Swiss-Prot record:
Stated name of the protein: Poly(3-hydroxyalkanoate) polymerase subunit PhaC
Function: Polymerizes D(-)-3-hydroxybutyryl-CoA to create polyhydroxybutyrate (PHB) which consists of thousands of hydroxybutyrate molecules linked end to end. This subunit has catalytic activity that is enhanced 100-fold by PhaE, the non-catalytic subunit.
Subcellular location per the Swiss-Prot or TrEMBL entry: Cytoplasm
Gene Ontology molecular function: acyltransferase activity
Keyword RNA-binding attached: no
Record lineage: Bacteria, Pseudomonadati, Pseudomonadota, Gammaproteobacteria, Chromatiales
pH dependence: Optimum pH is 7.8.
Active-site positions on this chain: C149
Length: 355
């Protein structure tokens, strides 16, 4: 007897279903319109070099905007439209719905003219000037910051160096301890000769970083998801959702060489938030200088920033008002999943409104 029970009728039906999905999928892919991302209306209010500062329009029916503006500081390594990927999966829309007056820094696409930019240029230069713009425009002394991933590390540095300008700080999937045992990216980076890489290439190509991130989970991120895509092909909406994510994953700006060199050395190799030694503009970054309320949000299934890498923030600041929020999802799901829309953004808005 054959060890596997194969029924010809069921096998035939499976093959027919597979062929139908492939055929319908080809039609859906050919007829797919341009993939839209960054769906919420916004206005450019300030620009400098490659940077553009956007203010999001308050939607009809939204509550009156809070007097203290919220500035989102995104990472350099990806594009910020992940926070506004589609109508029903938008961190931006969720924040607007809670009454936040939302601004976002779009870092743009650095080129060779930006090779010499340093962390000091980003933190004490670009971010500080955006904060000052908001302070003047809204007539307030302090703003709220929301830092995402690497942007969360930037926001921590900024809040430590400029505590007089930050009212509340929210960090999302932000690495603080860069050397937790389960941090695959950190383990990979430890033996990289970053000086050779930057001296050779100038800026670090975004494509190189893409494949580095994908290599951390090669089976699920480069193979299995495309096999699973067959099950989506006969649904035009699911195809568009899949393509939106693909667009974002592979839309990675090059990294300004000197900033990348310093960030890798100071944080991934020297674990600067825990060990010290990070100096910007002649001043050492000390998280104990952060005195404002802090909301630290992390994802329990995050393979890029493990939960313990974010949890390490507890006790490192001088804030008397520290709160953690653990989300049962991954690094991207914390922005785009249906569960995140119901739990994460409302929690951020409520936390800010209470302060």
């Amino acid at each position: 007897m054959f060890p596997i029970d194969i029924r010809p009728d069921k096998l035939t039906q499976e093959m027919l279903d597979y062929s139908r999905k492939l055929g319908q999928g080809m039609e859906n892919l050919l007829n797919a319109e341009a993939i839209d991302t960054g769906v919420s209306p916004k206005q450019a209010v300030y620009s400098e070099d490659k940077l553009v500062l956007y203010r999001y329009d308050r939607p009809e029916g939204a509550p009156e905007a809070q007097p203290v503006p919220l500035l989102i500081v995104y990472a350099l390594v990806n594009r910020p439209y992940m926070t506004d990927i589609q109508e029903d999966r938008s961190t931006i829309k969720g924040l607007l719905a809670t009454g936040q007056d939302v601004y976002l820094i779009d870092w743009g696409y650095p080129d060779q003219a930006d090779r010499a930019l340093t962390l000091d240029d980003y933190i004490n230069g670009y971010i500080d000037r955006c904060v000052d713009y908001l302070r003047e425009a809204h007539g307030v002394d302090k703003v709220n910051l929301l830092g995402i991933c690497q942007g969360g590390a930037f926001s921590l540095m900024y809040s430590a160096l400029h505590p007089d300008k930050v009212r509340n700080l929210v960090t999302m999937v932000t690495p603080v301890d860069f050397k937790t045992p389960d941090n695959l990216l950190s383990a990979w980076v430890q033996n990289v000769d970053i000086d050779l890489a930057v001296d050779t290439m100038g800026n670090i190509p975004g494509e190189l970083l893409n494949w580095t991130f994908l290599s951390l989970k090669p089976f699920s991120l480069t193979g299995q998801k495309y096999v699973n895509m067959v099950d989506l092909l006969d649904d035009p909406d699911k195809v568009k959702n899949f393509l939106r994510m693909e667009k974002w994953i592979f839309d990675s700006p090059d990294q300004a060489g000197e900033t990348f060199r310093q960030f890798i050395k100071d944080f991934y190799q020297n674990n600067g938030f825990l060990n010290g030694g990070v100096v910007l503009g002649g001043q050492e970054v000390d998280l104990k200088d952060i005195t404002c309320p802090v909301l630290n949000i992390f994802a329990l299934q995050d393979h890029l920033v493990p939960p313990d890498a974010s949890r390490a923030l507890k006790g490192l600041t001088s804030s008397p008002d520290y709160t953690e929020l653990a989300f049962p999802g991954g690094h991207i799901g914390i922005y785009v999943s249906g569960k995140a829309q119901k739990e994460v953004t409302p929690a951020i808005g409520k936390w800010l409104n209470e302060r």
